[in-house]
A protein has these predicted regions:
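Hydrophobic helical membrane-anchoring modules
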Residues: 2, 8-26, 165, 172-173, ...
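Cell-envelope/extracellular polymer assembly enzymes that use nucleotide-activated donors
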Residues: 27-29, 59
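Active-site beta-to-alpha loop of glycosyltransferases that engages the nucleotide-sugar donor
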Residues: 32-46, 66
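Residue-level preference for short helical/loop micro-motifs built around acidic side chains
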Residues: 39-43, 69-73, 98, 177
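Short beta-strand/loop segment that forms part of the nucleotide-sugar
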Residues: 56-66, 88-89
Length: 268
């Protein structure tokens, strides 16, 4: 039995085994990392379905990051009605980056789209993000949402603007807003990224590090439907400083990969 007393399909895989490969029958995997957002599950899944139905063959992967509310039971109930809904569970909360990575590793679509589980990210913008990745072909690794008309408090907006300004100045990633959960990217490219806690905040810089272009899509934010944020000011501040230093180091230490040609005995 899953937490919450509901039967649920669980996916378990070791970090050391081969990953599931992309499935041609699934074009897009929508990954939703969430913790204690049970009340937001049904309306968000409905909105995702309205946005993508008839345009792509897609699956929705909810990553339940150690929720202590009715999340598991709510997802199990919806899964009985929607065959394209999957639930992954973390036994304990490990954070958003780990939740996103679990979802991407389990995804069957060649393109992965992400959005937060609190309802602030509007799924209506998912088609624009996915189309930007498709249009970009092998050049574009990531389509990133950039929020306009944010519905957060004045203090939270100030925090975000200051953090984005500092990050952009140091990393020179050309990105106005890395905190938006609305993103779409190629699964294969994401999986070559160096993994660390906080990865999701630095995807544009790390994609550029690997030589990929970024497409930007303006999105309109919404107020949180219910629940409370899982982040505090000092959590963001100190962890963000350490992560920023680490990403700066990774970029500085990047080496160009030489062209490698194998010479065989048949070559003249």
């Amino acid at each position: 039995m899953a937490p919450g007393g509901a039967a649920s399909r669980l996916l378990t895989f070791s970090m050391s085994v081969d990953l599931p490969s992309s499935d041609p029958a699934v074009a897009v995997s929508v990954v939703v990392p969430e913790r204690n957002e049970a009340e937001n599950i049904v309306p968000l899944i409905q909105e995702i379905t309205v946005a993508l139905d008839g345009r792509w063959d897609f699956e929705i992967i909810y990553v339940n990051d150690g929720s202590t509310d009715a999340t598991a039971a709510q997802l199990a109930a919806v899964m009985k009605q929607r065959g394209n809904l999957r639930q992954l569970q973390h036994a304990v909360s490990t954070g958003q980056s780990a939740a996103v990575r679990s979802g991407v590793r389990a995804a069957r679509g060649a393109i992965v789209a992400t959005l937060d589980g609190d309802g602030q990210n509007n799924p209506a913008f998912l088609p624009d993000l996915i189309a930007a990745v498709e249009k970009g072909g092998k050049r574009v690794g990531l389509a990133a949402g950039q929020r306009v008309g944010r519905k957060d408090t004045g203090f939270k907006k100030f925090q975000s603007r200051a953090a984005n300004a500092i990050r952009s100045a140091i990393l020179r990633d050309g990105t106005r807003d890395t905190g938006c959960g609305l993103k779409a990217f190629r699964r294969d490219v994401f999986l070559i990224m160096p993994y660390f806690d906080g990865l999701h905040r630095f995807l544009p810089a790390l994609m550029r590090r690997e030589g990929y272009e970024i497409a930007y899509v303006d999105v309109i934010d919404r107020p949180r439907r219910s629940g409370v944020s899982n982040y505090g000011f000092f959590d963001r501040l100190w962890i963000g400083i350490m992560d920023l230093a680490g990403v700066w180091w990774l970029i500085r230490r990047k080496k160009s990969t030489p062209v490698v040609t194998e010479v065989t005995s048949d070559d003249d």
